Amino acid sequence: MNIILFGPPGAGKGTQAHRLVHDFGMVQLSTGDILRQAVKEGTEVGKIAGELMKAGKLIPDDLMIRILGERLDKPDTKNGVIFDGFPRTKPQVEALDKLLAERHSKLDCVIEIKVDENALVKRIVGRYVCAQCGAGYHDEFKRPHKEGVCDICGSTEFKRRPDDNEEAVRARLVEYHEKTAPILPVYEARGIVAYVDGMLPMGDVATKIAEILKEKGAKPISA
């Protein structure tokens, strides 16, 4: 089963994708990760991409599609994939359709994680991580058991992402609505979009997503 997790930055797409990888044996295909791996492996398209990246240039859609196609051809994608960061534009929607059709496959489901944006800003601005082990915390929702000490490794050093401030977060939301959100109606017209309340606890969101996928025929790997 091939799916897209859809929603604004900070909606929890990454967290839910990790759950699906674990529970359903799916592969998360992040365009950034795929690109870096292709460059590292030194494939033909990877070399071209590497030169563009060194020059500070954007990767064109046709090259990204070729890299994505190479990744889809690897055997670990047999249980399906979660597309992360792609597609983001209508031409990319068409390119993904073609890419899957060439492999006698298709996109089965788009799950939109719906969130209240003011609450989302609060969620993002308050998050921070342990500087040593990367364990995640939040000013309001998940503080360390002992103030100032990481629950996992005992470190007393923490850090925040530089762009996790309200101004930057709202700018990312504006960009999302202008550039990415317009592709959702394309999938809605096909009748393959399902909606999940992203303001529920993370475990409940995961349960809802799993129920949607099971209804569409996906089987957990433990089943």
UniProtKB/Swiss-Prot annotation:
EC number: 2.7.4.3
Annotated residues for binding of Zn(2+): 130, 133, 150, 153
Region (NMP): 30-59
Chain intervals for the UniProt region annotation (LID): 126-163
Pathway terms, separated by semicolons: Purine metabolism; AMP biosynthesis via salvage pathway; AMP from ADP: step 1/1
UniProt-listed Pfam families: ADK, ADK_lid
The keyword Iron-sulfur appears for this protein: no
Residue sites binding ATP per the record: 10-15, 127, 200
Highest taxon in the source lineage: Bacteria
PROSITE patterns: ADENYLATE_KINASE
Location relative to the cell: Cytoplasm
GO-annotated cellular components: cytoplasm
One Gene Ontology term from the biological process aspect of the record: AMP salvage
GO molecular function: adenylate kinase activity; ATP binding; zinc ion binding
Residues annotated for AMP binding in this entry: 31, 36, 57-59, 85-88, 92, 160, 172
Catalytic activity: AMP + ATP = 2 ADP
Keyword set, alphabetical order: ATP-binding, Cytoplasm, Kinase, Metal-binding, Nucleotide biosynthesis, Nucleotide-binding, Transferase, Zinc
NCBIfam families hit by this protein: adk (TIGR01351), PRK00279.1-2 (NF001380), PRK00279.1-3 (NF001381), PRK14527.1 (NF011100), PRK14532.1 (NF011105)
Function: Catalyzes the reversible transfer of the terminal phosphate group between ATP and AMP. Plays an important role in cellular energy homeostasis and in adenine nucleotide metabolism.
Family that this chain belongs to: Belongs to the adenylate kinase family.
Subunit and partners: Monomer.
UniProt note: domains: Consists of three domains, a large central CORE domain and two small peripheral domains, NMPbind and LID, which undergo movements during catalysis. The LID domain closes over the site of phosphoryl transfer upon ATP binding. Assembling and dissambling the active center during each catalytic cycle provides an effective means to prevent ATP hydrolysis. Some bacteria have evolved a zinc-coordinating structure that stabilizes the LID domain.
Protein name per the record: Adenylate kinase
Organism: Zymomonas mobilis subsp. mobilis (strain ATCC 31821 / ZM4 / CP4)
Gene that this sequence comes from: adk
